Amino acid sequence: MTIQIKNIIELSHRLVPGKEEFPLELTTFNTDEALAQTSRCSEHRIERREDIWYILQEVKLGSHVGTHVEFPYHHLKTGKSAADYPLNRLVGEAVLLDFSHKKKDEEITRQEVIDTGVVIRKGDIVFIRTDMHLLWKTPRAHDRPVLSIEATKYLVEEIGIHCIGTDATGLEVRGRNDQPVHELLFTHDVAMVESLTNLDKLRATRFQVIMLPLMVEGMDSCPIRAIALVEEDAR
């Protein structure tokens, strides 16, 4: 089998330890010293030359740091977590809906989704472009438009999409005491990807995407490396 590598567009933000909204910290150890303290390697300590760079790191990671995918377990006690969520809902064909003209707290309606003219099929991954990635790590980072509950129902109940993603930090009004869009998505086993970037670099409305989380049991959300695979003339 031959895998054709097309043009790759990076869709994840670069993360800097200690400078993110959610926890991200790295602690660095000498590998031999660190392994010597574990039961697995305590009897096999190696005195390596001092001029050899050989490190091991401990990572403190918030589950919602950077570009991340939220699983049903985020809102549903019986929902799937990172280790259980099927990858065929995070890898496949995606479509792009451009709502970059929308302002803070302005709703994206069902009719506006239809009026984009983009053909959305059952099993698609839907990306909503807001251009909020341009305000990443600024005081206005959360000044995002929102997806109406009617538009959400249209996507998950009438069409049957697999996943939804956005370059905003969310798709609901920030600070409210409930999250009906999240709950509707998760009830239909639809994961939600937040804080994507470079959606403005996608020239085609349909393309292939790969979004892979860590396979950690009980994890409600997980940072991902998301990429789009596009044809040469679609960049």
Region roles according to the model:
Residues M1-R235:
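Active-/binding-site microenvironments in catalytic and ligand-binding cores
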